[in-house]
């Protein structure tokens, strides 16, 4: 796998960042039961997969198989399972819900309007996520504050009122450079699309490569304004952390 090129910057902060992420996850595991990690197999999520498996943390890993993921992402799931000797659970949309969406909007109707795109995300992502989070105490994400304007005020730990559980963001204050320095240092597997100009990878028809100078999430739903570019998985409807109840428009992509 070709190494992704990164700026020549100091990595002095990386050990501190890594230790803080490990401590946060370890603390959450001491306090709560039934913790899950939602991975999209992006670079940040590969950092967390490495930490969770290396530290043997009791955190179950799952992904949302939307039915429209790039081939490279699907192949990476198998690579990760072999590399870490673990299983990534897959949650898929209900076929009837997909059929209803296609009947109303068309297979690629998400290009036509923000409501149509949000409806697709609800069917392919939000409903499967609800099933994955049911009965859990907390979920872990690879979100970083610098990724977009919708994530600028991201805390490391918060109460997810929409889903009724804690949400843990161990990489909230990490930079993109720190993420890639970690991947290089620990030889973590990652999606080859990152080497082709895709810093953020979602469903194949909704992701494009970015050009020099563009925001890291510019390739996600690129036909929309930045303020609407969230699928709803991480919408900002959060309350202060609650006390624990537990003890202790191009439609063709050449790369997909």
UniProtKB/Swiss-Prot annotation:
The cofactor remark states: Binds 1 [4Fe-4S] cluster per subunit.
Copy the pathway line from the protein's UniProt record. Sulfur metabolism; hydrogen sulfide biosynthesis; sulfite from sulfate
- Annotated localization: Cytoplasm
Q: Which GO terms describe its molecular function?
A: 4 iron, 4 sulfur cluster binding; adenylyl-sulfate reductase (thioredoxin) activity; metal ion binding; phosphoadenylyl-sulfate reductase (thioredoxin) activity
Q: Where is the active site?
A: 231 (nucleophile)
Q: Name one GO cellular component term.
A: cytoplasm
Tagged with keyword Membrane: no
- Single biological process term from Gene Ontology: sulfate assimilation, phosphoadenylyl sulfate reduction by phosphoadenylyl-sulfate reductase (thioredoxin)
Q: Which UniProt keywords apply?
A: Cytoplasm, Iron, Iron-sulfur, Metal-binding, Oxidoreductase
The answer to keyword Oxidoreductase applying to this record is yes
Which cofactors does this protein require?
[4Fe-4S] cluster
EC nos: 1.8.4.10
Top-tier EC class: oxidoreductase
Reaction it catalyzes: [thioredoxin]-disulfide + sulfite + AMP + 2 H(+) = adenosine 5'-phosphosulfate + [thioredoxin]-dithiol
Record-listed [4Fe-4S] cluster binding positions? 120-121, 203, 206
**Highest taxon, organism lineage:** Bacteria
Kindly give the NCBIfam families that the UniProt entry links to this protein: APS_reductase (TIGR02055), cysH (TIGR00434), PRK02090.1 (NF002537)
Purpose of the protein: Catalyzes the formation of sulfite from adenosine 5'-phosphosulfate (APS) using thioredoxin as an electron donor.
Q: Which HAMAP family match?
A: CysH (MF_00063)
Similarity-based family: Belongs to the PAPS reductase family. CysH subfamily.
Q: Can you say what this protein is called? A: Adenosine 5'-phosphosulfate reductase
**What organism, scientifically named, is this protein from?**
Allochromatium vinosum (strain ATCC 17899 / DSM 180 / NBRC 103801 / NCIMB 10441 / D) (Chromatium vinosum)
């Amino acid at each position: 796998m070709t190494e992704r090129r990164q700026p020549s910057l100091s990595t002095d902060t990386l050990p501190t960042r890594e230790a803080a992420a490990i401590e946060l996850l370890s603390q959450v595991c001491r306090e709560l039961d039934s913790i899950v990690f939602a991975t999209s197999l992006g670079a940040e999520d590969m950092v967390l997969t490495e930490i969770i498996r290396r530290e043997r943390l009791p955190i179950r890993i799952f992904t949302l198989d939307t039915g429209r993921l790039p081939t490279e992402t699907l192949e990476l799931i198998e690579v990760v399972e072999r590399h870490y000797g673990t299983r990534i659970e897959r949650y898929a949309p209900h076929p009837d819900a997909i059929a209803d969406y296609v009947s109303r909007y068309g297979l690629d109707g998400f290009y036509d309007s923000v409501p149509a795109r949000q409806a697709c995300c609800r069917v392919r992502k939000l409903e499967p996520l609800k099933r994955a989070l049911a009965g859990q105490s907390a979920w872990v994400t690879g979100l970083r504050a610098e990724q977009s304007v919708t994530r600028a005020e991201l805390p490391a730990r918060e109460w997810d009122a929409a889903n009724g559980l804690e949400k843990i963001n161990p990489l909230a204050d990490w930079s993109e450079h720190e993420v890639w320095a970690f991947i290089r240092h620990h030889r973590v597997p990652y999606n080859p699309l990152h080497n082709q100009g895709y810093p953020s990878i979602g469903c194949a028809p909704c992701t494009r490569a970015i050009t020099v100078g563009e925001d890291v999430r510019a390739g996600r739903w690129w036909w929309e304004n930045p303020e609407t570019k969230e699928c709803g998985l991480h919408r900002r409807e959060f309350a202060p952390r609650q006390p624990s109840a537990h003890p202790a428009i191009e439609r063709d992509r050449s790369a997909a």
